[in-house]
Amino acid sequence: MAEHFKQIIRCPVCLKDLEEAVQLKCGYACCLQCLNSLQKEPDGEGLLCRFCSVVSQKDDIKPKYKLRALVSIIKELEPKLKSVLTMNPRMRKFQVDMTFDVDTANNYLIISEDLRSFRSGDLSQNRKEQAERFDTALCVLGTPRFTSGRHYWEVDVGTSQVWDVGVCKESVNRQGKIELSSEHGFLTVGCREGKVFAASTVPMTPLWVSPQLHRVGIFLDVGMRSIAFYNVSDGCHINTFIEIPVCEPWRPFFAHKRGSQDDQSILSICSVINPSTASAPVSSEGK
């Protein structure tokens, strides 16, 4: 999100903040000083847009006052935005010792012996059929359940191209095709094609996230009725769901699909950093 703001207020020519923004006839904006760097039309004094080659005469070039004001506001708020939209290291004291619940895992998910990693496979694992298992969607739940308190965990998505992580209600549908949306009890962020990120709101919310995102931090505060997602590598905020319902337990949720037949990417729950401090404040129900 912070990087998206920076792109909006940055001159595409000199890459400095657009404090003196001007706009060409086509809508292209740059700073006043960079007008001289634009190519002139062959037989006149008009300027050619760098992107669409539309010619702007002198009278077509206007100051972009609203953008100038936006730049000023963002620069003023930037220190506050950094403190609000970044991960608080103290969240880690609520880190949960979490594992995958094999009884809920789709049979085409290959889960490690320590129950902390999985990948998609071609062959069914021949686990017994039961109502709590996802029979079609490539999903698995985590344990423990959460009914109160604050809880934090990290998920390493590695090089996976298609994934979703977050929480879901205990009662979500697990049979047949499922729709990952807040209306159906799923509060998740996910990735498609390794570069398209979105949150499971209705309608879906596009997310501006670094393509190098490999580890997602998730902070669930049942008392405050919110769940927040962070990019652990740089601490940047990804998305927050607020006013979440608390009428039933929440379960950690994970989904993964191979991008191709050769894709051997793995999705993992990260180890607890300091179990002695991470487990004490957590209030949760065991399975």
Swiss-Prot record:
Domain of life: Eukaryota
Family matches, as PROSITE patterns: B302_SPRY, ZF_RING_2
GO-annotated biological processes: innate immune response; regulation of gene expression
Organism taxonomic ancestry: Eukaryota, Metazoa, Chordata, Craniata, Vertebrata
Alphabetical UniProt keywords: Metal-binding, Zinc, Zinc-finger
GO MF term (any one): ubiquitin protein ligase activity
Leader sequence residues: none
Matches recorded under SMART domains: PRY, SPRY
CDD domains from the UniProt entry: SPRY_PRY_RFPL, vRING-HC-C4C4_RFPL
InterPro entries the record matches: B30.2/SPRY, B30.2/SPRY_sf, Butyrophylin_SPRY, ConA-like_dom_sf, PRY, RDM_domain_RFPL, SPRY/PRY_RFPL, SPRY_dom
First and last residues of each zinc finger (RING-type): 11-53
One term under GO cellular component: cytoplasm
Family matches, as Pfam families: PRY, RDM, SPRY, zf-C3HC4_4
B30.2/SPRY domain boundaries: 78-276
Encoding gene, per UniProt annotation: RFPL4AL1
Name this polypeptide is given: Ret finger protein-like 4A-like protein 1
